[in-house]
Regions:
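Acidic, metal-coordinating helix/loop segments flanking the phosphotransfer/catalytic sites
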Residues: 34-52, 62
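Receiver (REC) domain switch/output surface
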Residues: 26, 113-125
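C-terminal output helix
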Residues: 90, 108-117
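Short amphipathic alpha-helix used as the core "switch/output" element in two-component signaling
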Residues: 43, 65-77
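Two-component/phosphorelay signaling modules centered on CheY-like receiver
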Residues: 13-33
Length: 178
């Protein structure tokens, strides 16, 4: 793990403190932050890069499903874990359809909590690695294309290069739309 930020949101200060203490103690490489309002935390989530968000599903001022949608709109890859007071199949279905990463039911066992948060952090880390690798690959391809353009130009084969470049761009557009 690499000093990942985790945001815990709960309006119950005792549970918020307990969850934060547990994660700080057991996930020493994670930077744990807390908030007592899901609605107020949306601005924080917009401006700070988190590896995971753990939120009580029953928040005043914003329901869990709209909260998950708002977070996913800002950061589509950010894992949002919801804590439910009791099993609620309808809410679970709606939350998962909105993009929730994991649903946990209180009281959640420490091992289950740690496993879920660790997995969310790892997913964030892997997604970041993939994003960096894609950027490096794109830069390498663009560099090679620039070299090819120079070579084709030097040998008077510019029209062949333009046809090749058109097919590469079409292929790139098709793969990004998937």
């Amino acid at each position: 793990m690499h000093n990942s930020r985790v945001l815990i949101i709960d309006d119950d200060s005792i549970l918020l403190g307990t969850l934060a203490a547990t994660l700080r103690l057991r996930l020493s490489d994670a930077h744990v932050e807390t908030a007592d309002s899901a609605l107020a935390s949306l601005e924080r989530i917009r401006s700070i890069e988190y590896a995971a968000v753990l939120c009580d599903a029953y928040q005043p001022h914003i329901e869990s499903v709209p909260f998950v949608r708002a977070v996913r709109k800002m950061h589509p890859a950010l894992p949002v874990l919801l804590l439910l007071e009791k099993p609620d199949e309808d809410l679970v279905r709606q939350a998962m359809n909105a993009g929730a990463y994991e649903i946990l039911v209180k009281p959640v066992e420490e091992g289950t909590l740690l496993f879920a948060v660790n997995r969310a952090i790892e997913v964030s880390r892997l997604r970041s690695q993939v994003k960096r690798a894609e950027a490096q690959l794109l830069a390498a391809v663009e560099s090679m294309l620039a070299d090819l353009e120079e070579l084709y130009g030097a040998y008077g084969l510019r029209s062949h290069f333009e046809a090749f470049l058109g097919s590469v761009n079409a292929e790139r557009q098709a793969s990004w739309q998937k």
